[in-house]
Amino acid sequence: MKKTHITEQNFADLGLQPQVIDGLNAKGFIKCTPIQAKALPVLLAGQDIAGQAQTGTGKTLAFLTATFNHLLTTPAPEGRKITQPRAIIMAPTRELAIQIFNDAESLIASTGLKAALAYGGERYEKQQQVIEQGVDILIGTTGRIIDFYKQGHIDFKMIQAVVLDEADRMFDLGFIKDIRFIFRRMPAPTERLNMLFSATLSYRVQELAFEHMQEPEHVVVEPEQKTGHRIKEELFYPSNDHKMALLQTLIEEEWPDRAIIFANTKHKCESVWGHLAADKHRVGLLTGDVPQKKRERILEEFTQGNVDILVATDVAARGLHIPQVTHVFNFDLPNEAEDYVHRIGRTGRAGASGNSISFACEEYAINLPAIEEYIEHSIPQSDYDASALLEDLPAPLRLQRRPQQNRRNNNGQRQGGNRKHSRPRQPRNTQS
């Protein structure tokens, strides 16, 4: 039987509160994805869960639905102040925290529960003002949440529901001490509903679950394969001298509607951005030190189609809901095998097809065996003709001289680049 990304389970048949159903209907959510169909009955019965599912499977909606429903069906603690949150949702990055908040908007509107954001990179006072107006659900990153706690603006004494999203990423980013700090200041695990979600349920993630949860049930949705079957994978072995020219040649051959290019370092991302921007592509840059407001604007432009290509470090690879990405380019093979899956999982989502093109260059080809062992298959290899690569490419822009990019001419047509002509290129020879 062929698996699909939607089940026959209706949200309306799960016994959810009418206000929650209204919020789901407002966004067109009628039937559950597999992780929702498995997790929600467990959570609605009051049982903690440690859920495992790939990015893009609907786990965010699963824990939001359970959280809002739990607060509607559970009386608020006696003596609670409006600045004492009843639920807390922790995410590894501010982008993911913002995305979770945006996904919750229809439930906020339909239930009347108040939510607030807490993350670094934005004015402390602005977030504080929202919290002081009352907060039922606090969504954010651990560092800023702890800042508010230490300043006395919030406490965790009235917490009735907890979500830890992307738990494995929390470990990778070194946030485990912050997580334990917050957990240890909450009511006992038996007095709250606890939800942990992770792409992998490694030993350290399971250890965290059993330390701070009440006998969580494991809910696992295994994919047919670690990389989506709708994603066409392709691998090249370029020399370091050919990498950038090969990337630009492939972009003009593939002409992706919406692409993400991943590199392993901020410096490399800036270099790739500079070459593509000079060639008049509509390209955005997303790295860890880009100011928060600018990051939000870049993501919005990419989502709305005003930017065609996003060059990013792994900060964009986990948790963000960026629809209709047609291509993912691994300019550098990631150092961690799991990150390969998370990167290419940006495409081929919600039943759509996608394309993943990876470079095994002189520097990062050493990572390929571990990646192929992890995904349990070899990535199909393709050759390229070095003499057919684009040569008349403009010098890269420097980041501080970033101009306004426009990838369309006055007639509204997309431009092919900044060259007087393009060299004819031979078709690639794909090997199985």
UniProtKB/Swiss-Prot annotation:
Example of a GO cellular component annotation carried by this entry: cytosol
Gene Ontology MF: a single term: RNA binding
Entry's transmembrane regions: none
Keywords: ATP-binding, Cytoplasm, Helicase, Hydrolase, Nucleotide-binding, RNA-binding
Major subcellular site: cytoplasm
Motif DEAD box: positions: 165-168
EC number: 3.6.4.13
Region Disordered, residue ranges: 397-432
Residue ranges occupied by any Helicase C-terminal domain in the UniProt entry: 245-390
Catalyses which reaction(s): ATP + H2O = ADP + phosphate + H(+)
Pfam families: DEAD, Helicase_C
Record-listed ATP binding positions: A53, Q54, T55, G56, T57, G58, K59, T60
Compositionally biased region (Basic residues): 417-426
Protein localization: Cytoplasm
Chain span(s) of sequence motif Q motif: 9-37
Biological processes annotated in GO: RNA catabolic process
Family recorded in the similarity comment: Belongs to the DEAD box helicase family. RhlB subfamily.
Protein name from the UniProt record: ATP-dependent RNA helicase RhlB
Name of the encoding gene: rhlB
